[in-house]
Amino acid sequence: MGTSISRRLLTTGATLVLLAGVVAGTTAAQADGRSGTQGYSGSGHHAPDTDLADDFNVVTRNTDWQQTSRLKLNFPTFHTEGIAYSQDHIFLSAVQILEPTTKFPTPQGGYDRTPGKGIGHLFVMDKAGNLQKDITLGEGDMYHPGGIDFDGTNVWVPVAQYRPDSSAIIYKVDAATLDVHKQFEVKDHFGGIIFDKQTGHLVGNTWGSRRFAEWDLQGKELSTWENPNYFIDYQDCQYVPNARMLCAGVTNLPQTPAAGGTAATYELGGMAMIDLTSHAVIRDVPFQKWSTAGHVATRNPFKMTAAGSHLTMKVAPDNGDEGNGTEILTYEADVAPAK
């Protein structure tokens, strides 16, 4: 066989191998698209970023958190619930109360209070906090959005009745197009949700975060477990690689008799990291920084990021009619790496 022929055959073979690799890669990408997990940091061949899990594992009560910025929102925000960040937008969930719920003397029909009336909002802002769109969510008695999570493509939002042991709708909002898709309905009040990028499943927490549930994307419940932690009620959570969930929230505790007793409350704030495989609380720490209106900073919307050993926390504890209105507060801290 001539040298020129051999070279042509080798070139042709290499081209076929290259084309096969491209086709295989395209097929894999299309499969990712069908499963709804494209674009996530936990998919593909990239190693997930574990900075946040590693850093939070050394956060203590003595971690020196410093407030570094305060972003005032100049539109009606009502009662804020959850926050999430995409590349281009800030998303803030909130409930507008039209008629408050009223407790029954004794439970009626399985409920401890009236449903009340309200409007669920998902505010879409640019990174400067300017309102770009107000998305209304909910149906009938289900008008109360909760904690939200951004999975790299979509923002997941639960909208529940404003009472325990009720029902909720799980929404998916495309972060780029802002298209809204009603994913499924569930029994019970679910006031928070995260997307587990390792499994492609959703995990939600009920009223007071007393119970967690895991679903597939069609709403089939795959597992449920009780929360072993009683320090705080989780208000807003986020997925953390690998297979963890970071939550923050608040518990209202009675004051001392001299300070008003049960008629007054002390807001205990805090954060907790939960293992989504073992369901154990890996680490929980209190957080006692205060807003303009005097609320603990982790009262409602909360998200955290890490870069190396540097942590950044975003919170929005005040309602639109409190203090200086809703402000997104930024706290930052450096932590020592684990030994």
Spans of features found by a protein language model:
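Secretory targeting and sorting signals
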Residues: 1-32
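Beta-propeller domains
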Residues: 39-69, 91-135
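Short, conserved, GDST-rich strand-edge loop motifs in beta-rich repeat architectures
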Residues: 42, 92-117, 160-164, 250-268, ...
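A short beta-strand motif characteristic of beta-propeller blades
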Residues: 66-73, 130-138, 179-185, 220-227, ...
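Repeated scaffold domains used in trafficking and secretory/extracellular systems
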Residues: 77-82, 140-149, 186-198, 230-239, ...
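Short coil/turn segments that connect the beta-strands within blades of beta-propeller domains
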Residues: 87-89, 152-153, 198-200, 242-244, ...
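Short loop/turn segments that connect beta-strands within beta-propeller blades
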Residues: 125-130, 173-178, 216-220, 275-279
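Loop/turn-rich, solvent-exposed surfaces of beta-rich toroidal or solenoidal domains
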Residues: 230-283
